[in-house]
Amino acid sequence: MGITGLIPFVGKASSQLHLKDIRGSTVAVDTYCWLHKGVFGCAEKLARGEDTDVYIQYCLKYVNMLLSYDIKPILVFDGQHLPAKALTEKRRRDSRKQSKERAAELLRLGRIEEARSHMRRCVDVTHDMALRLIRECRSRNVDCIVAPYEADAQMAWLNRADVAQYIITEDSDLTLFGAKNIIFKLDLNGSGLLVEAEKLHLAMGCTEEKYHFDKFRRMCILSGCDYLDSLPGIGLAKACKFILKTEQEDMRIALKKIPSYLNMRNLEVDDDYIENFMKAEATFRHMFIYNPLERRMQRLCALEDYETDERYCSNAGTLLEDSEQALHLALGNLNPFSMKRLDSWTPEKAWPTPKNVKRSKHKSIWQTNFQSENTHTPKKENPCALFFKKVDFVGKTLNEEIEANQRLEQAKQTEAELFNMYSFKAKRRRSPSREDSVDQERTPPPSPVHKSRHNPFAKERTGEEANQRSPVVCENASLLRLLSPKKASPLDGEAGVKKVDSLKRSIFAKEQVQIRSRFFATQDEQTRLQREHLRDTENDDMDEQKLSSHSGHKKLRLVCKDIPGKNPIRQRCSSQISDGETDTDTTASSLLESQDKGVPSPLESQEDLNNSQPQIPTEGNTNSTTIRIKSLDLLLENSPEPTQESDRNNNDAIILLSDDSCSSDQRASSTSSSSQQRQNFLPTSKRRVGLSKPSTAKKGTPKSRTNGKLGAVSQNQTKLSMFGFQTKPVLK
């Protein structure tokens, strides 16, 4: 029954299917397959001639299962035997007769188990058994149709006419009739194997462009079918190889080349085989079926479609001229073999439905107003991670769903916004142009804690918070950032000061961030406390000496005219310059104390002291000027004679490098005079700060040190040129 090995051969074109995947569709069922399975369970009773309905209940299980999945079944039964299958049917009858005789003999011998196997083989499904099932289906409003000849051709037409979207069968011959979707091996769990005609080229191993269904049909006929036996040694594999190799459309010429193409020299292909091959192909194409929509018999495919000679259609059946007889045959009221009338049921009559029986609610194909709804069920697809919501375009809430979808789409971010959020953009750091004119308007520098800076944890500050002094921030371990007064806030707090040096990694705006070295955090505090204690002790001793020796003289203080305001710590440092403390030590310690204690630095507190100091009369100013001149003369007379080394120190002043070149002119003018005055009476021995080492040169033999970039360096100067100090001429 069918083509041997065809279902495994088409494995690449098949897939697993469950009935829930085709919910709401219509299926055509080869009912004789169910009847043969049902008869297998009650073969002993049927062989003995006992009455049973086991096979009926077996078929109804499948019917109820289909109805539970909202699937409309159309049960199709076989009709008359074709002349082409006369030989096949004769062999089947002989086999059943032999099995029946063997079963009776085994029962007489008492070998019951062996007799049962033969009894199953000898049982045949008759039309009377099929009629009992048809009556049960009528009570459930399930359509049944009896084909004029083969049920395979009838089901293929229903599938191609889109009356049924799927076909359920166990006969592999159905694929040769051109069915689109066939379900094999359906069980009571609802699982089956779906074979799709559009994927058959995968089973043949050719591309879709070179594939045609006629090639598949011819391959199956060559391998052997119900209408034609195969040639010796020819199966599906060799038949497929030959069909793919030949390009001849006329099979009468191509079949003669089989021995040479398949390298089978002993194989003979006679004219009788070629004639039977053409008849078998015409039978699969042009078999008669019954059209329930038009209530008439017709061919599966018209002869004009393939330009087939009618003489090859002798095995495809004959047309019944009486349309009324053809209708009752299709309804199951006639015996297809004897044409004896068995029932008089018509679709217009209502069939009584027993209680507790599930009735189908689908429209019958026998109704005159029946039309194919063309409701295609979507095919089973691979599971997808995305969830697609089904939109009902016929419902009343169509506009609401569209508006909701539009709101969701508008709320989503655009592609450009997403790229802007997740893409890394390296920003260029551009050095501002050097402008000679100071009066030209400059845009204020951006905030140093802007999001684009390298510090991702900094927070933006408002206008009020920006005016306040920010706490000390340890940015790196550079000694230059610790000792350079240029890193403090600008002198006058001017807005619009532009940073020029592009080599620095971070640019800080005025009064926003102070830089403090982490390296000298602990050592600087200890050094500052020691120096403060020494200065206090020396200050007390010197006060006692001055009170005893110079009781008549007034205590004089050096006041830098360019820097009128100083904090108390800076005043104490400047008053004790002559006691051995260097200007560099005093400046560094004062800066450190101002940063640690939160006291403004001397340069920063200049503007505040100028505003807070009361106005002194002109006469007082003259007296103070005279006192300063006299005190300077006394100090110059008491000071030792300067050496060549000290002269060079007097002519030079320590200038600190900074990133802020715009404010360097103002700072240099404010500190040049005071630096020059302090350098005039600096002692030869100086205290070293930071990483500097004491000089190893012998006393009395001064040796000038040179620097490749900064030139000659004074011996008395600290070794801080590596951190940004250099010697420059004092601005006059």
UniProtKB/Swiss-Prot annotation:
Q: Which residues bind Mg(2+) 2?
A: D171, D173, D226
Q: Which Gene Ontology molecular-function terms are recorded?
A: 5'-3' DNA exonuclease activity; 5'-3' exonuclease activity; 5'-flap endonuclease activity; DNA binding; double-stranded DNA 5'-3' DNA exonuclease activity; flap endonuclease activity; metal ion binding; single-stranded DNA 5'-3' DNA exonuclease activity
Region annotation (N-domain) ranges: 1-99
Ranked from the top, the taxonomy reads: Eukaryota, Metazoa, Ecdysozoa, Arthropoda, Hexapoda
**Name of the protein in its database record:** Exonuclease 1
Q: Does the keyword DNA-binding apply?
A: yes
Which Cys-Cys disulfides exist here?
none
EC number(s) stated in the UniProt entry for this protein: 3.1.-.-
Q: What is its main location?
A: nucleus
> What's an example GO cellular component term for this entry?
nucleus
Q: Which residues carry this modification: Phosphothreonine?
A: T443
Relay the cofactor remark from the entry.
Binds 2 magnesium ions per subunit. They probably participate in the reaction catalyzed by the enzyme. May bind an additional third magnesium ion after substrate binding.
Query: For Mg(2+) 1, which residues are the binding ones?
Result: D30, D78, E150, D152
Specify residue ranges for compositional bias: Polar residues: 572-593, 608-625, 703-716
Query: Where is the region I-domain?
Result: 138-230
Per the similarity annotation, which family is this? Belongs to the XPG/RAD2 endonuclease family. EXO1 subfamily.
Cofactor(s) listed: Mg(2+)
SUPFAM superfamilies recorded for this chain?
A: 5' to 3' exonuclease, C-terminal subdomain, PIN domain-like
Q: Which SMART domains match?
A: HhH2, XPGI, XPGN
On tissue specificity, the annotation reads: Specifically expressed in the female germline.
> Domain of life of the organism in this record?
Eukaryota
Residue stretches of biased makeup (Low complexity): 661-677
In terms of InterPro entries, this protein maps to: 5-3_exonuclease_C_sf (IPR036279), EXO1_H3TH (IPR037315), HhH2 (IPR008918), PIN-like_dom_sf (IPR029060), PIN-like_EXO1 (IPR044752), XPG-I_dom (IPR006086), XPG/Rad2 (IPR006084), XPG_CS (IPR019974)
Q: What does this protein do?
A: 5'->3' double-stranded DNA exonuclease which may also contain a cryptic 3'->5' double-stranded DNA exonuclease activity. Also exhibits endonuclease activity against 5'-overhanging flap structures similar to those generated by displacement synthesis when DNA polymerase encounters the 5'-end of a downstream Okazaki fragment. Required for DNA mismatch repair (MMR).
Keywords carried by this UniProt record:
DNA damage, DNA excision, DNA repair, DNA-binding, Endonuclease, Excision nuclease, Exonuclease, Hydrolase, Magnesium, Metal-binding, Nuclease, Nucleus, Phosphoprotein
Q: Which organism is it from?
A: Drosophila melanogaster (Fruit fly)
Residues of the region (Disordered) are 422-471, 524-625, 661-716
